[in-house]
Each structure stands twice: as structure tokens, then as C-alpha cells.
Amino acid sequence: MGLKIAVLAGGTFEPERSIVAANDVIAALKEAEHEPELVMVDGGLVDTLLRSQPDVAISCLRGADGESGDIQDVLEAANVPCVGSSAAVCRRAYDKAGLAEALQAYHNLTEDVTTAVTAQSLTLSRRAFGAWGAEAVLSQIESRISSGYPLCVKPASASAAQGVRRVENAEQLSEALHEALKLADRALVQQWVEGVELTVPVIGTGWNAFALPPVEIVPNAGWYDAAARATVGAVELHTPVRNASLSPSEPDAQAIRAEIERAVLEVYRALGMRDCGCIDLIWDGAQAIILEATANPNFAAEASFAQAAKAAGLTLPNLLNELAESALDA
């Protein structure tokens, strides 16, 4: 007899896409002979969970609803095991400003040579702008980030490229920071990184975790911003990444791909992620520049996670079955 699995969907961010993913998950779980139930996340969520008493939950929530750790807090309080990382780890992964520190701590602990690097960046808070006149330091930022303009401005905690801007001068920098600080308490100003944009799903926990084939993201126009992410057909996904995108030499491309996968696993382990996740990065021609980590991946059949699993020879029913069993045993 299969597990009784609550599939959480809806929420406040892209609820329609959340429901699409949930329906794909439900179909896969039924094929794996489990008993999935669609649970809409609203004011009656806890009552529904306490009444139905599922064995495991899988979150198909999008954005902060699924990634910030809040829904995991609720599930932990309700004593419902959930596929994926703990609430604390979700919060850590959601905080882009803490990524470099987490990688440094991992390096200090393991004493391994670290492959993963983050973009050079500065962090400014809403409080600094409102109470301490931080606007005045903007003229100094170009000299603090060695690459100079263009720069990338993003909220420290947001998803789906919300609030991410490319800025070319101090005037745009000020505007972008104020917009980013409407979405989060802190904002990052980073070097703008050009290269091959990739997302790499990971399965497993600790030293048993492994990377699925990297997925190459190619916008049809411009860069992979919030509009491109939200528009059907605006982006091409190549699974796995094309060798030619990494190097004209196939052996070199394979070596680069192995380096990318090592970097991804460093991030995954540094953050303490379990079961599954995705790491976004740019290969700049010399190294893997980590952009962010997602502890609650999109399980829709057409999304990068499922496509990477398929490229690795894994079916969505088998994958979700393994993840549900792992969550139950955690």
C-alpha cells in the first residue's frame, strides 16, 4: 500500500503554475501507486493537514511561499514530514547574501579546495537607506566592485528573478536598489557576470547527493529576467548543457561539466540541503559563479528538474517515490 501524500499547491505567487506542477506530481505519484491528495494552501491549511493526517507532504508552491521556509515551519509544527530541506535550511538557501559565508564555512570545515565561487558583491539594508543616509555611499560602489558597471542589483531574499536589475550607472543603481528594497529588507549589488547560464538539480543528502545533468538556459532575447521566466516560449532549455556552449573541445567541455557539478555539490552541502534542490550559476569561461540555491524545486513535468531527471534516465514517478520515502525516513 502506498503512502498518503499531501501535494501542496496554490499560494500567493504564480498559483496557476503551482497547480500545474501539483497535477503533474499527483499523476506521477499515482503511477508510483501512492495516494496523493491536492491540498490548496489557504487559511484552512492546518485544519486540513490535521484532519487528513498525510504520511508525507510535497510542496509545489512557488516563490517565497515554497522557498522561504515558512511552509516548512508549518509542516514541522504539524508533524508532517516534507520532501526537501528543513525550514532552517530553506531560510539559509533563500538568503542570497549569506551564500558566500556558507561556502567559506564549508571550506573551513572540510579543508577542501573550493570550486564554487560567488560574484563580488556588497549588501545594503532598507534600514541603512531609511535611517543612516546610505544613499550617499552609492557613488563609492563602482570603486568597491572591481568590474565596475554594469552591475546587478537584486533583493537578498526573493525568487524567480523578482527585482533583479542590470544597471549601467549611478542613477539606475539608486532606482534599482530602492525597487529591490521594496521586496526584501536587504539588497545585493554584484558584479554583472556574462556567460552560460545553467541550473543544476541535485538529488540526495550529504555525501550521497549527486548532480543531475546541467540544464542550459537560453533566453530568446535579452537575459533571463523575471519577464523571461514568466513568459511561455521566451526561453529554450537544453538538457544536458551543449558541449559547444562550454568549449569547442569535447574533452574540455566534459571536464568543465564535471567542475560545474563539483561546484554545485559544494553549495548543496554547504547549505545543508537534503532530498532535492537546484543550484543556479553562470559559467563565465573560467569558473562556476554561483547565483543562488533553491531548496524547493519546481516538479512540473516540463520544468528543468524533471527534464534533467529524464536526461539521467530517471522517471518522475520513480524520482518522487524515492523522495517521498526519503522524507518519511528522515
Descriptions of predicted regions:
Residues 53, 79, 184-185, 272:
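Residue-level detector of structured alpha->beta connecting loops
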Residues 165-247, 251-255, 259-262, 289:
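Phosphate-binding site of ATP-dependent enzymes
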Residues 1-9, 36, 49, 92-195:
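Active-site nucleotide/adenylate-binding loops and adjacent lid/helix of ATP-dependent enzymes
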Residues 1-98, 125-136, 322, 326:
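ATP-binding N-terminal substructure of ATP-dependent carboxylate-amine bond-forming enzymes
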Residues 37-42, 191, 199, 273-285:
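A short glycine-rich, hydrophobically flanked beta-strand micro-motif that places a catalytic Asp/Glu
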Residues 250-330:
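ATP-dependent carboxylate activation and anion-phosphoryl transfer catalytic cores
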